[in-house]
A protein has these predicted regions:
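Amphipathic alpha-helical and helix-coil boundary elements used as assembly
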Residues: 1-351
């Protein structure tokens, strides 16, 4: 969730993609985090030829290269309501897509806008007396841009069929000898980043074992591709131009943890009751472990007032000059729920 929210791509990479023999030990895989296209590496051969695949060929090649297009929103608009401004707060307005969706009409006239209403991470006091951070547009602007970049990524990609064996997801290559690209495109437009790979490999088994396997596949109603019968191996790639910004899919409503009601222990600065003028308390969530919080002086697992920000306490009745408060005491267990299912907005419902 955090990597999606911060536009960080991730992939599992091989430390050594090719082993010289079956006796060579396999090295550990690497988790790569990439937040900029410039950090994607080129494959070792760098260039791949668009050509037929044949046993007589010296090098593997790409045999089919087809553009895939889909209609996406031409503009992204994000907004949210903030109490301290008493208005609907917008980002920098609708962000128009940089992708050209029509040869006859511009993006503005198409009016395919996608609008989002985002729940804020906090609701501040109208008088600004609760120490809450002032609302701003920076987060909305970032989300607006990220959603727009993802829609542009989905607008056009390419499907390639190849016999290239040493090709890896998260690497880029230059496609050569493609008639359309050679005629009408610059060298930068011939560089493609691999986002997805499906592959087919044929086992090199003795004939009797192969016949038994084929019978088992038939009995299991599994189907093998007729196009692959004459090939020992093949793969299908999803690629985009290297110049297109790559961001992970992020849906603010879907890609977030499910927040359930849970318990927490009341923490204080040493007093029996520790609240601010708003009746808010501080708590330690029961799932926290000391080892996980040593990097920040133990905050979160110290059993004192450094364990959380101020947390609102629900009361039976409240207002200016009337109402009632029942203040939780040190080390008592309270029940925590979350506004709008947002883990950043906890509140105490009772004890």
């Amino acid at each position: 969730r955090l990597m999606r929210e911060e536009s960080i791509n991730w992939l599992i990479d091989e430390a050594s993609y090719i082993v010289s023999s079956n006796k060579q030990s396999i090295e550990a895989q690497k988790l790569r985090l990439v937040d900029d296209n410039a950090q994607f590496k080129a494959i070792e051969r760098r260039s791949i030829r668009y050509h037929r695949s044949n046993a007589t060929e010296q090098y593997d090649s790409i045999t089919s290269f087809i553009a895939q297009r889909s209609l996406q929103p031409t503009a992204i608009h994000v907004q949210r309501w903030q109490a301290d401004s008493l208005s609907q707060e917008d980002a920098s307005g609708p962000v128009l897509s940089s992708h050209k969706h029509s040869a006859n009409r511009d993006n503005e006239s198409l009016s395919l806008e996608q609008a989002w209403s985002i729940s804020p991470a906090w609701i501040s006091d109208l008088k600004g007396e609760d120490q809450a951070t002032k609302s701003g547009n920076s987060q909305l602007d970032k989300l607006n841009t990220q959603l727009n970049q993802y829609q542009a990524l989905q607008s056009k990609y390419f499907t390639a069929h190849s016999s290239v064996r040493d090709i890896q997801v998260g690497y880029w290559f230059q496609l050569s000898d493609h008639p359309e690209l050679e005629k009408n495109h610059s060298s930068d437009d011939k560089e493609f980043l691999i986002l997805n790979k499906h592959y087919y490999n044929q086992n090199n088994l003795p004939k009797d074992l192969k016949d038994q396997l084929e019978k088992l596949l038939t009995l299991s109603h599994w189907e093998t591709s007729k196009d692959s019968e004459q090939e020992r191996q093949a793969n299908e790639l999803m690629v985009v131009r290297r110049s297109i910004t790559v961001v992970p899919e992020y849906d603010p409503l879907q890609h977030r943890p499910v927040a359930h009601v849970q318990r927490a222990k009341v923490t204080t600065d040493g007093e029996e009751i520790h609240v601010d003028e708003w009746g808010r308390i501080k708590v330690r969530f029961l799932f926290t472990r000391t080892d996980d919080h040593s990097h920040d002086g133990g905050a979160g697992s110290n059993d004192n007032d450094t364990d959380s920000a101020w947390v609102d306490v629900l009361t039976p009745w409240a207002g200016e000059g009337y109402g009632a408060r029942f203040l939780p005491r040190k080390d008592e267990l309270v029940v925590i729920d979350f506004f709008d299912g947002n883990i950043d907005r906890p509140f105490v419902t009772g004890r």
